[in-house]
Amino acid sequence: MSSARPSARDRILSTATGLFNAHGIRGVGVDRIIAESGVAKATLYAHFRCKDDLVLAYLRATDTHWRGALTEAAEAAGPDPRDQLAGVFDALGAATLRDGFRGCAFTRTAGETEPGSAAHTATAEHKRAVRAWLTELARAAGAADPAQLALRISLLVDGAMAAAALEPRPEFAEAAREAARALIAEACPARV
């Protein structure tokens, strides 16, 4: 049974994702994406009006993937929201073991774009959305200040990703998880 060939749009986005992850968004030109995806220039521009639109599509796809991985890891940790908060670090540990891991795509993109640009705004929106989700988990866990606990956990995630970008090792995610567990224990009273 033959599998269907991905659409031209999907090939372009997949190629751009790999290149942006490996070289950054400024380190990759449209001509390289066209050459490596095997599409004509007109095809790329039929799907993405400009490189900025392609970068936004990359960020949206990465957001969907990463938030899905976080949710899956949290749910796999069990029904207790305290365990789910610590479980997000399983997604981080798995990500750091992927070949070519270069840290957080959103942090990298923020560093390559001008504040106020669409891509920079999308990176900030992603970080806010993750913190909002963590805040809801912290609220469900009974944290006295859910937003503060979520902020601290998100900083642990970002710090572990930055460390693993320099030296990909699962120990960073494990250390961040243990630090998160201490914060969770302090912020969330034990349930009887």
Regions found by a protein language model. Give the residues of each.
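Basic, helix-initiating cap at the start of DNA-binding domains
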Residues: 1-23, 27-39, 53
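Generic hydrophobic, amphipathic alpha-helix propensity
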Residues: 8-16, 33, 58-62, 66, ...
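Short hydrophobic/aromatic patch on the recognition helix
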Residues: 38-48
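Hydrophobic alpha-helical connector segments
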Residues: 57, 71-98, 150-153
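Amphipathic alpha-helical packing segments from all-alpha helical-bundle domains
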Residues: 64-71, 83-87, 116-141, 151, ...
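Amphipathic alpha-helical segments used for helix-helix packing
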Residues: 84, 96-118
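Hydrophobic/aromatic-rich alpha-helical bundle segments in the mid-to-C-terminal region
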Residues: 119-124, 139-192
